[in-house]
Amino acid sequence: MEKREFKAESKRLLDIVINSIYTNREIFLRELISNASDAIDKVYYKTLGDSSLTFNKDDYYIKIKPNKEERTLTISDKGIGMTEKELDENLGVIAKSGSLQFKKENEIKDGFDIIGQFGVGFYSGFLVADKITVITKAFGADKAYKWESDGVDGYTISEAEKDSFGTDIILHLKANDEDENYDEFLEEYKLKSLIKKYSDFIRYPIKLDVTKSRVKEGTENEHEEYVEEETVNSMVPLWRRNKNELTDDDYNNFYVEKRFGFDKPLRHMHISVDGMISYNSILYIPENIPYDYYTKEYEKGLELYSNGVLIMEKCSELLPDYFGFVKGIVDSQDLSLNISREMLQHDRQLSRIAKNIKTKIKNELESMMKNDRESYEKFYKSFGRQLKYGVYDDFGMNKDELKDLLMFYSSKEKKMVSLAEYVERMAEDQKYIYYAVGESNERIEKMPQTEMVLDKGYEILYFTEDVDEFAIKMLMNYKEKEFKSVSSGDLGIESEEENKKENEENKGIFEAMKEALGEKISAVKASSRLKNYPVCLSSEGEVSIEMEKILSAMPNNQGVKAQKVLEVNTNHEVFNSLKDALENDRDKFNLYTKLLYNQALLVEGLSIEDPVDFTNDICKLMK
């Protein structure tokens, strides 16, 4: 038995494989199981071309055998096996893929699904082992061979004894240290967990001897342990089954099994795409919002599989942020993986899949809004805010994608309505889509600014979330109808001539009020929108009063202020008191003006700038 050196730069490359390529030790089992699956696939392919051979799938499986006494973990398969030459060529040369070589030699086209691509997966065993022993017998061969290496000083190949074709890979685990407990890879629960996590959908049974408990024969309460071989993996993934044969319960159970959520999802999508891109997917729209959804801890992403093998637990590239609530899986053979299969190469295929998924989700939501309004409103209650963030984010790049999914509470319908539904009901003479901003529907209904719009019979949309107005400002218009806040300076329904006349007739008192308030407001003018209230605040420019409130509450705010206009109802009896005070008692006039301004602030939900001064003014008024 001679000692053989790894070929060419293989020794250095092996060190890179062990220490640099793989970032997660536990994937060694995924790699070795995938290799075992490929080996069985090769037997199947051999039998296709030889009528004298048969392939009974029930005879083929992968066995995982931990040995705690010897601290070894064995992965066995009933696969194609290797000759002495193949052992030397495949395991003596790092990064030579025996699977790819097999495809070339047998002129196999891409339809034959072999997982291995790079020829390094076997060496991931050195992540947890300081020695690897391989005992193998090639399909149709008489002799078996043993390959052995410590991953440092080359390897040896010698003849061995093995009854049937296939391969046993024996990992001699490293000694435990302060940082790593390698013994955990001998524990039944850990092995089952890794198989379910990474290799649940390998097409052949993965078997493990499992310790179970039962009532001892002849007793009532005495239990005994026994060992039973158990198939751990599911084998046939749900997404590869005929969707016409699946029930809602099948999808719901899968949702819970994958721990996407513990309640029933609101909707599921089973997608199978072939063509320029090929992938299978099952996507879920949750009914309830995850507890951490609007926190930094939440991670979006779909489980990503390649040929049924888990590559990434959360592939964020497959979902835009505004659809980050979607759960599910994607399986594709067309992905360009990096050498460790832990990460993706950024390529067109991934982008195409992501684009296709985005379209599928949008279509599903539009269908839900149209055909199952009750379910859509449940969804929107949980995730509507995220859609509105999507409109606002990235400088409005996605606004056209999302605008038809938005809904707001309607003053006329007393329920949530879409923008399309609002526009369809607009009066012929109505120029704008009107909205009001407030902390709640009840608060908005008491706003003095709504009076004139409602008197015209126009509908008002209620914006009660902090993102609402920011999203609409980014949207700007819908079906060529501009959005207009009821608190804006010009509603488009006032009589310009009457306004001009009112402002000219009361120019003196308005100038005096502006002088009393100073820089707190940009102007005082007559209001045509008020009926029952003496004053209200409106705004001019891009920043509304509500936006000022939101921005001022943010850390490191830049002191952004709305240009506030104090509008005065010249038909209100308080206005007569103001005129009298201006003529007879300027101090009282200034007091009235300040009180009216503070009243307008309170109605808007804004803080009074000087509460002590305000209470003193009230006391003066009561003397």
Swiss-Prot record:
Region listing for C, in residue ranges: 550-623
One Gene Ontology molecular-function label: unfolded protein binding
Keywords: ATP-binding, Chaperone, Cytoplasm, Nucleotide-binding, Stress response
Compartments where located: Cytoplasm
Entry-linked InterPro entries: HATPase_C_sf, Heat_shock_protein_90_CS, HSP90_C, Hsp90_fam, Hsp90_N, Ribosomal_Su5_D2-typ_SF
Keyword check for Repeat: no
Pfam families: HATPase_c_3, HSP90
Residue numbers spanned by region B: 342-549
Residue ranges of the region described as A: 1-341
GO cellular component, one term: cytoplasm
Presence of the UniProt keyword Chaperone in the record: yes
Family: Belongs to the heat shock protein 90 family.
Known partners and oligomeric status: Homodimer.
Function comment: Molecular chaperone. Has ATPase activity.
Protein name (database record): Chaperone protein HtpG
Species this chain originates from: Clostridium perfringens (strain SM101 / Type A)
